[in-house]
Amino acid sequence: MKKMPVLFVGHGSPMNVLEEENPFNQNFRRITQNFPKPKAILMISAHWYSSRLQVTSGEQPEMIYDFYGFPEDLSQVQYPAPGSPELAEQVRSLLQPENIELNPTRGFDHGAWAVLKFLYPNADIPVVQLSLNRLQPAQWHFNLAKKLATLREQGVLIIGSGNIVHNLRAISWEHINQIGAGYDWAYAFRDHINQAMTTQNNDELVHYEQFGENAALSVPTPDHYLPLLYVMALREPDEKVAFFNDHLIAGSLSMTSVLVG
């Protein structure tokens, strides 16, 4: 079996789900036409940011509507993909000696279903989510991700879902739907990170704070940035990156997405 690629997706606002024909969602649909259908998906979402390492192990995870102040239609969205207790157990085994908890009741958060709905709209591929341990530094996450590499050879698509630039306090709501609306500091940080990915400078990706104020404004908390490190950690030395949805919206949100492999 050909090794599966790895994918980072900028998920942006939950409202994207209700705008089925927006260009970001159209590109999500297109990108999965470039490689074989996976046997299963391992999702690392910014929206499962916990004090311990966990993995979903239920057979039919429920939907989690982890947002407030949005239209009721958004809380009616369904993505009834099955879980995979077998993959969950395999992930737990691969990540040893880290203590990882199987969570049979945790469902899919919007960092997962809001993009999977367009990547694989039939919801017929088993999905497992891995949490982000908020108590650990970036280097720990990068090193942990490397332990998942063998899954790529077994037909598992590993997806990181977050945003390289994600500052909700700085959002310009009047530009929420305007592609190309970004603050100077957001563009500068996005460009630094894109260049580090292009040249495979993993040290700069892990130690992103070296980019000073641009980094502090773009990544005020690491939750939305960390999923990118899981994807980049799984990149082989000879693998190229392909950018898509590489735009800023609302001043301080980047939709930049990257296919590896």
Predicted regions: what is each one?
Residues 46-50, 60-61, 108-116, 164:
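Short glycine-enriched loops at secondary-structure junctions
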Residues 19-23, 82, 138-142, 219-222:
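Conserved phosphate-coordination/catalytic loops
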Residues 5-9, 40-45, 130, 151-164, ...:
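Beta-strand elements within well-structured catalytic alpha/beta cores of enzymes
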Residues 93, 97, 125-126, 134-136, ...:
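Surface-exposed, charge/polar-rich loops and edge strands
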Residues 23-34, 139-154:
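Long, well-ordered alpha-helical scaffolding segments within enzyme catalytic domains
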Residues 88-142, 147:
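Internal, conserved structured core segments that host functional sites
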Residues 74-82, 104, 131-138, 215:
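Flexible, glycine/proline-enriched loop segments at strand-loop-helix junctions
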Residues 2-98:
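A short aromatic-anchored loop/beta-hairpin motif
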